[in-house]
């Protein structure tokens, strides 16, 4: 683990049939425009153009996705943990509710850092340590995931994990064909 990119890891842990089920269930509901949080003003706003759609998951969807997320996070911790009396073992114990993302033609996720505050509601407390992106399909063009200006190729069922801090700026490029379905969560 000598290079900063060593902490960007992809594991394929979501069954393809579960990915399809999640897409089908989400498309029976109403999507909303993504909003960016401005920590200075305390406001949430969407960009005027090219903003992707988002949707919270249901408790049932979260329960069905949990085994895949837990398996990926366990593997991540085994790979990136440093040996030592106080550094080994499990250091991630929870992850936030999933938020589904939908990038249709002409939309994107602009480059940003994951300095997420909104996942903590006063009852759930912690510091986001690992950003999680789950890829639910791959029958689209464009919508490439870039982290630190490098493309990370994702297949159906992949879970991408990386540290949730300013050293990992990331984005999803504009979708040019089809629709990209994914989800995000943060582990702490």
Say what each PLM segment does.
Residues 1-159, 167-188:
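Fe(II)/2-oxoglutarate oxygenase catalytic core
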């Amino acid at each position: 683990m000598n290079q900063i990119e060593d902490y960007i890891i992809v594991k394929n842990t979501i069954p393809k049939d579960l990915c399809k089920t999640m897409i089908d269930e989400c498309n029976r509901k109403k999507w909303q425009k993504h909003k960016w949080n401005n920590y200075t003003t305390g406001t949430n706003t969407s960009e005027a153009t090219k903003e992707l759609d988002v949707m919270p998951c249901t408790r049932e969807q979260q329960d069905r996705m949990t085994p895949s997320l837990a398996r990926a996070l366990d593997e991540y911790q085994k790979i990136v943990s440093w040996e030592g009396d106080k550094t080994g073992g499990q250091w991630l114990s929870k992850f936030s509710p999933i938020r589904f993302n939908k990038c249709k033609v002409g939309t994107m996720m602009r480059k940003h850092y994951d300095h997420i505050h909104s996942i903590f509601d006063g009852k759930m407390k912690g510091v986001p340590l690992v950003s999680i992106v789950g890829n639910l399909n791959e029958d689209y063009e464009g919508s490439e995931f870039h982290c630190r200006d490098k493309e990370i190729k994702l297949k159906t069922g992949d879970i991408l994990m990386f540290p949730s801090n300013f050293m990992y700026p990331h984005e999803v490029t504009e979708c040019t064909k089809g629709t990209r379905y994914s989800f995000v969560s943060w582990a702490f």
